[in-house]
């Protein structure tokens, strides 16, 4: 686990307000979960010594992050793979309970919401293809209540169809953000490789597909949107990770957190970005009234602290896909016992006492390990309860667990 904080080296770093805002400077603009304006407000209130207003500002920021709702409209013609795309983003299989219905026949005649199973404030709306409704483009968008969505994703497979162009034009005219996703590129690559084994060039095939999309938009007088090539069967390849990055960076700051932690753990990069988002959240929580004190913290954890820690660990394990349900799914897919999957990672055993070590002793050891690895968290005249350190420790542990399982998944596939 890498060093999270550096030791204070100047008077500027050696005060609480500067420590608070300075921490967020390590995250680039597209990765922050709180705006600079709010950070400046919190720092100002800290400098004035108004603890109540400071805590109020931090609490309000956390509430806005937690309560923000993201509505994503996904539209495309029958067979384009839009329902599979929605299921992929929700981290569930096409045949699992609650999955968006897939098929070669249009199964969506009205818009249908699909909440993310772990982050219910993230909602994907499966819209019927415009061709199946017989509505003109503008009427289609009105019927689908276009104004309710944060952005649109247009899904298209194989070659462009008139309906793809019509819906893109209508969305553009209404000044709504949209992204174009060309699916099933794995099939295109396979077909080219089989048909032209001597001259096959994978990168050229992808380049030609992308260029065809660009030219089609231009020929129809549409400013080309962000274009992404992907396969719902191989989401860790092609443009899927790039698409996720683009969507997050384009979102309003306060809506980024929920979307980021909802994403499937398809690459080490996605897992690491989740960790960076959650680090910021823990930092905000660390300055809330129940974690920052003007007197030294207790040398032991209260029962209420343990419950808070268990809740945090459960949340981290869920968003990183190492919770009990996810482990059971992996065990079923790999045809092994759940205990064997649990043995590959560390987080399931954190709150299980052993003959050698009680839970309290284990948590105390974690705190010591964390402090040795990270040095100063805040100026020496500030005191934080152990729960703050442990949340960071748990986050690092679960992140590494997720990477371990992802590596195992790749080896077995």
UniProtKB/Swiss-Prot annotation:
Outcome after substituting residue 108 to A: Abolishes interaction with T.gondii GRA7. Abolishes GTPase activity. Reduces GTP-dependent oligomerization
GO CC, alphabetical: cytoplasm; endoplasmic reticulum membrane; Golgi cisterna membrane; nuclear membrane; symbiont-containing vacuole membrane
Annotated binding of GDP, by residue: 79, 81-84, 102-103, 184, 186-187, 232
Disulfide bonds listed in the record: 236-410
Enzyme Commission code(s) on record: 3.6.5.-
Keywords, in A-Z order: Cytoplasm, Disulfide bond, Endoplasmic reticulum, Golgi apparatus, GTP-binding, Hydrolase, Immunity, Innate immunity, Lipoprotein, Membrane, Myristate, Nucleotide-binding, Nucleus, Phosphoprotein
Keyword Ribosomal protein appears in the UniProt entry: no
The record's account of how the chain is modified after translation: Myristoylated. (Microbial infection) Phosphorylated by Toxoplasma gondii ROP18 from virulent strains.
InterPro entries assigned: G_IRG_dom (IPR030385), Immunity-related_GTPase-like (IPR007743), IRG (IPR051515), P-loop_NTPase (IPR027417)
Outcome reported for the amino acid change (mutating residue 164 to A): Blocks T.gondii ROP5 binding
Protein's UniProt keywords contain Lyase: no
Lipidation (N-myristoyl glycine): 2
Subcellular localization, as worded in the UniProt entry: Cytoplasm; Nucleus membrane; Endoplasmic reticulum membrane; Golgi apparatus, Golgi stack membrane
Family: Belongs to the TRAFAC class dynamin-like GTPase superfamily. IRG family.
Quaternary structure note: Monomer, as apoenzyme and in the GDP-bound form. Homooligomer, upon GTP binding. Interacts with HOOK3. (Microbial infection) Interacts with Toxoplasma gondii GRA7 in GTP-dependent manner; the interaction results in faster turnover of the GTP-activated IIGP1 oligomer. Interacts with T.gondii ROP5; the interaction results in inhibition of IRGA6/IIGP1 GTPase activity and oligomerization.
Protein name according to UniProt: Interferon-inducible GTPase 1
Organism: Mus musculus
């Amino acid at each position: 686990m890498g060093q999270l904080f550096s030791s204070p080296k100047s008077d500027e770093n050696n005060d609480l307000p500067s420590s608070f805002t300075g921490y967020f400077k390590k995250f680039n603009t597209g990765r922050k979960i709180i705006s600079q304006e709010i950070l400046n407000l919190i720092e100002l209130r800290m400098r004035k010594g108004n603890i109540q207003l400071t805590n109020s500002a931090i609490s309000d920021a956390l509430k806005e992050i937690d309560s923000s709702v993201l509505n994503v409209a996904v539209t495309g013609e029958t067979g384009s793979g839009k329902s599979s795309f929605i299921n992929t983003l929700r981290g569930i299989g096409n045949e699992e309970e609650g999955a968006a219905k897939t098929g070669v026949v249009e199964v969506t005649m009205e818009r249908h919401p699909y909440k993310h199973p772990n982050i219910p404030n993230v909602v994907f709306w499966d819209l019927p293809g415009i061709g199946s409704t017989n509505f003109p483009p503008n009427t289609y968008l009105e019927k689908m209540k276009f104004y309710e969505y944060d952005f649109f994703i247009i899904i298209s497979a194989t070659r462009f169809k008139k309906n793809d162009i019509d819906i893109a034009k209508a969305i553009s005219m209404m000044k709504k953000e949209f992204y174009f996703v060309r699916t099933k590129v794995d099939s295109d690559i396979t077909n080219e490789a089989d048909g032209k084994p001597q001259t096959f060039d994978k990168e050229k095939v992808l380049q030609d597909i992308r260029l065809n999309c660009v030219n089609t938009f231009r020929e129809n007088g549409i400013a080309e949107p962000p274009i992404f090539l992907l396969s719902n069967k191989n989401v860790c390849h092609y443009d899927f990770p790039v698409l996720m990055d683009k969507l997050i960076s384009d979102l309003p700051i306060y809506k980024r957190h929920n979307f980021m932690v909802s994403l499937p753990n398809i690459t080490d990069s996605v897992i690491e970005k989740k960790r960076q988002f959650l680090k910021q959240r823990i930092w905000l929580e660390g300055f809330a009234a129940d974690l920052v004190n003007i007197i030294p913290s207790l040398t032991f954890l209260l029962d209420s602290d343990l419950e808070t820690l268990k809740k945090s660990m459960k949340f981290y394990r869920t968003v990183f896909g190492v919770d009990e349900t996810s482990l059971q799914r992996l065990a079923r897919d790999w045809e092994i016992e759940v205990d064997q999957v649990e043995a590959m990672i560390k987080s399931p055993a954190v709150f299980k006492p052993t003959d050698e070590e009680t839970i309290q002793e284990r948590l105390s050891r974690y705190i010591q390990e964390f402090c040795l690895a990270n040095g100063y968290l805040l100026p020496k005249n500030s005191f934080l309860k152990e729960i703050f350190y442990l949340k960071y420790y748990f986050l690092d542990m679960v992140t590494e667990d997720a990477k371990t399982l992802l590596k195992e998944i790749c080896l077995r596939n």
